[in-house]
Amino acid sequence: MASMPKPNQSARGRVTVVLGSQWGDEGKGKLTDMLAGEMDICARCAGGNNAGHTIVANSGPDNVKTKFDFHLLPSGLVNPKCIGFIGSGVVMHVPSFFSELDTIEKKGLKCDNRLFVSDRTHLVFDFHQVVDGLKEVELGGSSIGTTKKGIGPAYSSKASRSGLRVHHLYDFDTFAAKFRKLVEGRFKRYGNFEYDTEGEIARYRAFAERLRPFVVDGVTFIHSMLSSNRRVLVEGANALMLDLDYGTYPFVTSSSTGIGGVCTGLGIPPQCIGGVIGVMKAYTSRVGAGPFPTELNDEIMTHLQEVGAEYGTTTGRRRRCGWLDLVMMRYSCLINGYTCLNLTKLDVLDNLPEIKVATTYMLGDKELSSFPADLNILAKVDVQYKTFKGWRGPISNCTSYEQLPDTCREYIEFIENFLGVHIEWIGVGPGREAMVHRPLPPHEM
């Protein structure tokens, strides 16, 4: 095992982070795919297989365009020279890890000796998934609409200090004893639901040996990479408004999905982070229950759903859609400190006669000065909008900012000025190449 590296000032700024800025499904995977070609490592820092995205990339000996679905593995693996790393802040369902790995390798994407898992990563078991479903049933009309992947119950085990981590697999008798105790606790809470405890233990004995070559001391691994001047791309899961602390609680996920979760999930200090790219749709969507101030229920909503293909990669559920919410985005920018933004799915707005963005929340005759923590207040706000003329034509063939219609650029620049953050990347179509890059002029950097 490599010795623990000393703190290295040369690691300063070598990490680039891609984060969702809304309620997820912003299109982080596309930008991650593009940036991964310039990176040495692509890392996951939080969440589990409860989120997902699809990437189309050339693969195999014939270099054929192939579709890859990523849920748990870092999507930067589509770059055959990029190392994938699952950090300590992730919760990992081992069967899903191997299922996803086997699927992408069958499609020609080989991951031998370039995929690693922190030994501190917590494990998601099948009983966590059963409990997830039972809890949703128990909540009834108050359910939050989880993916039922066991993520919340696994993080609950972690927070209550009863969870099991990857390293526990390599003291298997202790693992088995702790596992039985963990399941017994769930039986006491939810009754004797159908579950084969001993069968699961037997499966994990086999999983432990198959997983062994992937397991590393996560802290030593990531800092050794940074000390070797490797460039790291961090692929955020979910998005800021699903963050356990700063999202629309309790309609959130169970992990830290913002910039703080990057440091705690990978074991790196803040000074290692050189850039934070916030990914935002040109409109807003969310899956499951929870408040949504700009939600639409008309033909515009249908347009956004159909043209934007707003169906969840993980659940297949139709996403709720509405106008871009700049009040929420300003809150997101404050917390995550984006150095630039990637505006995605702008082409979905192509044929709309007019386009709106939310600029103000009013409560009675009072303007709210911040995004409210209290969801009862959020449910009562009146949203004020700025309306733009639509550009009424396709933009998918635009390859430079100057080629975009004037009204389209007006929309982009209003968002940019409102948020005070430069929009560097603009998605103008579903294809990998349909991205306009708009770097800041050197004198403005």
Curated annotation (Swiss-Prot):
Quickly give the catalysed reaction: IMP + L-aspartate + GTP = N(6)-(1,2-dicarboxyethyl)-AMP + GDP + phosphate + 2 H(+)
Query: Which UniProt keywords are listed?
Result: Cytoplasm, GTP-binding, Ligase, Magnesium, Metal-binding, Nucleotide-binding, Purine biosynthesis
Residue sites binding GTP per the record: 24-30, 52-54, 319, 345-347, 427-429
> Which GO biological-process labels does this protein carry?
'de novo' AMP biosynthetic process; IMP metabolic process
Name the InterPro entries on file: Adenylosuccin_syn_GTP-bd, Adenylosuccin_syn_Lys_AS, Adenylosuccinate_synth_dom1, Adenylosuccinate_synth_dom2, Adenylosuccinate_synth_dom3, Adenylosuccinate_synthetase, P-loop_NTPase
Its Enzyme Commission number(s) read 6.3.4.4
Q: Where is the active site?
A: D25 (proton acceptor), H53 (proton donor)
Q: Is GTP-binding among this UniProt entry's keywords?
A: yes
Quick one: where is this thing mainly located? cytoplasm
Record's subcellular location = Cytoplasm
Superkingdom of this protein's organism: Eukaryota
Q: Recorded GO terms, molecular function?
A: adenylosuccinate synthase activity; GTP binding; magnesium ion binding
Q: What class of enzyme is it?
A: ligase
Q: How is the cofactor bound?
A: Binds 1 Mg(2+) ion per subunit.
| Residues given in the record as substrate binding sites | T313, T314, T315, G316, R317, R318, R319
Its annotated pathway reads:
Purine metabolism; AMP biosynthesis via de novo pathway; AMP from IMP: step 1/2
Which cellular components does GO assign to this protein? cytoplasm
Q: What does this protein do?
A: Plays an important role in the de novo pathway and in the salvage pathway of purine nucleotide biosynthesis. Catalyzes the first committed step in the biosynthesis of AMP from IMP.
**Complex and partners:** Homodimer.
PANTHER family in UniProt? ADENYLOSUCCINATE SYNTHETASE (PTHR11846:SF0)
Q: Which NCBIfam families match?
A: PRK01117.1, purA
HAMAP family, sorted: Adenylosucc_synth
Query: What is the name attached to this protein's record?
Result: Adenylosuccinate synthetase
